[in-house]
Amino acid sequence: MSCCAYFRGRDCLQTYEDHITQALEACERLRPYYGRWMEKAFGTADAAALAVEFHDLGKLAKAYIAGNRARYRHEVLGAYFALKTLQTEARYYVAAAVALHHEPMILAAYAGELGERAIHVSTLRAMLKDSDLSLGCTPNYSYRPEVAAALREWASRPPTADDVADAFQELAVYLSGGAPEEARVKRLRVAGLLHVLTVCDNWGARGRPGEGTFISRYMTVSELGL
């Protein structure tokens, strides 16, 4: 049985496996342009591919499958598992890019509804408290060892709302730490990785009716030549 990357109502319009596979194809097409920069910035040219494989991992949660998408945003668990599974400093950047790849939506869900301008850790904890964060579907594609490790951990012990909130607190401390110049460099690295992830994600979502903004479609055409 395939997992689902995109529901319309209760109908699955794109499988998880198809979406990730197509997004990884875009990632490989972009590697000649961004690979050397990623190697220098993150210590690995695979940073974008890792972000692609983690970015929708949260869609495998029972909360997402059940349709509880008003209080549960899938980016949150994808970022959590990237931060907790990856072993190098790159995990902070991959997790941040994953958390922000639908930034307007996550802000609307966790900040806008409460009249806030930013997402607070306490809000994140409260919003996730009643969501079923257990693994609801195991994808059927040849995923990376890091993703396999995350899925094993998830199946054996689902994270709690406190686990996720604590991880985001750790992420925020890392990204905001250091001298002002160091913090700016960190933000630029996140922005660069997020840009590539967004292009790959939109390429992976091609064919979905009405999906993507003008800007995201333009990026896909201009950078991938399609």
From Swiss-Prot:
Keywords: Antiviral defense, Hydrolase, Magnesium, Metal-binding, Nuclease. Coiled coil: none annotated. The keyword Ribosomal protein does not apply. GO terms for molecular function: metal ion binding; nuclease activity. Induction: Repressed by 5 J/m2 ultraviolet light and 50 mM NaCl, slightly induced by 20 J/m2 ultraviolet light, 100 and 150 mM Nacl. Member of the csa5-cas7-cas5a-cas3-cas3'-cas8a2 operon. Its cofactor is Mg(2+). Its EC number is 3.1.-.-. It comes from the Archaea. Mg(2+) binds at D56, H74, H101, H102. Residues 9-204 form the HD Cas3-type domain. It is an enzyme of class 3 (hydrolase). One of its GO terms (biological process) is defense response to virus. Proteins of this family have an N-terminal nuclease domain and a C-terminal helicase/ATPase domain. In some CRISPR/Cas systems the domains are swapped, in others they are encoded separately. Monomer. Can form a Cascade complex with Csa5, Cas7, Cas5a, Cas3 and Cas8a2. Belongs to the CRISPR-associated nuclease Cas3-HD family. CRISPR (clustered regularly interspaced short palindromic repeat), is an adaptive immune system that provides protection against mobile genetic elements (viruses, transposable elements and conjugative plasmids). CRISPR clusters contain sequences complementary to antecedent mobile elements and target invading nucleic acids. CRISPR clusters are transcribed and processed into CRISPR RNA (crRNA). Cas3 plus Cascade participate in CRISPR interference, the third stage of CRISPR immunity. Acts as a ssDNA and ssRNA nuclease, probably with both exo- and endonuclease activities. NCBIfam families: cas3_HD. This is CRISPR-associated endonuclease Cas3-HD. It comes from Thermoproteus tenax (strain ATCC 35583 / DSM 2078 / JCM 9277 / NBRC 100435 / Kra 1).
